[in-house]
Amino acid sequence: MRRIALVTLLTSTACGAALAQGAPAPVNGDSRWSLGAEAMLAWFKSSPTPVPIITDSYLNAPGVNVLLGGGSVDTNPNAGFKITGAYRVDSRLGIELTGFYIPTRGTSSSVSSSGQPGSIDLYLPFYDVSINQEDVKEISYWPQYRGSAQATLSNNLGGGELNVTLTMPPQDAWRVDLLGGFRVLQLRESYTITTSSPYNPPNPADIWMTTDSFDARNRFYGLQFGARAAYDQGPWVGSAIGKLALGTMQERVSVNGFLETNDYNDYGPTQVFSGGYLALPSNSGDHSRNRFAVVPEVAFNVGYRLDAQATVYVAYSFLYASNVARPGEQINRNINPTQAVAYGNDPPATLIGAAQPNLNFNTTDFWAQTLSVGFAYRF
């Protein structure tokens, strides 16, 4: 028997619309529509990955080194785009619609050991609830097998807003817009841990690979209100905006793990067994809940009007979301290894004792700040 790893809703949405619109009233009576496009760079709050994934000893051993996991990960900076459309009903009333998307970006870290003399052994540490003490699963173990582990974080962000604006009577070059509307946001992140631990010669060539996947999807739906102060003097325009959205964050966490091996069929075709090392039958599946969330945003921008219709601008924004689920925080290292073949149990493995790990559904906050350059045109 063998074997014992919102939001950037963000980027100055209403500010871009302000520059696209220019002054409170169109330059000519027909310029009621405006369109804007932005190229963005976004920096997200790092994604927590507090659970140590790979160490060189037992986690409670003196001088142990954490080689993978046990910190936080980010994919910064993240490139994206935003489109803004606005329609001015009259000199005071307007409608603004914005959509943005920051495509999936990933980052990986890995560690490996040859399993040869002089190499270190790699361990996946966990707390074994069946014996109530710290334990490890060998990923590489000299001289029997070599091993490697990789942790990958990927994320994307998208959303949109629909606002109605009301312009207060202007004061010289200044004006104030009140706004209210609806905001949506989706933040999706995946944290995946893969390992490979094949035998070293002269043992038979085999396959022993695990995958543990934690996926978190957060969808926000809320009503928002805010105000914008805009300055318009000659070719220069600028604005500052504050907004607050209140609503529901729909949090969904999907957990999936499996082992691929041919160790149990005389090294024949690869078999797949449920459960990896951290995503096991007891915590696998889809888990969801709704939480109240607050999403405030502040943004600033400065633009230069090329002519009566075209404007170029730069913008900065900061957005905060009070409640999101992030994948690395959903890992529970309290494990009952009896339920998984990956821990060296003969298939089919049967749970004996407590059904651990379970999903605790941990939540935290999230922020994103962005820099962007844009072009607006009104007609």
Residue ranges: model-predicted function:
Residues 19-36, 44, 48-49, 166:
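Outer-membrane beta-barrel biogenesis signature
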Residues 21-26, 89-91, 165-171, 229-235, ...:
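Outer-membrane beta-barrel proteins
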Residues 29-33, 81, 91-95, 172-178, ...:
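Outer-envelope beta-barrel architecture signal
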Residues 37, 83-87, 160-166, 180, ...:
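Residues on the lipid-exposed face of transmembrane beta-strands in outer-membrane beta-barrel proteins
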Residues 41-45, 101-105, 182-188, 233, ...:
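Transmembrane beta-strands of outer-membrane beta-barrel pores
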Residues 48-57, 61-76, 103-156, 187-219, ...:
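Extracellular/periplasm-exposed beta-strand and loop segments of Gram-negative cell-envelope proteins
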Residues 69-111, 159-161, 177, 184-186, ...:
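Glycine- and aromatic-enriched membrane insertion/assembly motifs of diderm outer-membrane
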Residues 364-379:
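Outer-membrane beta-barrel "beta-signal"
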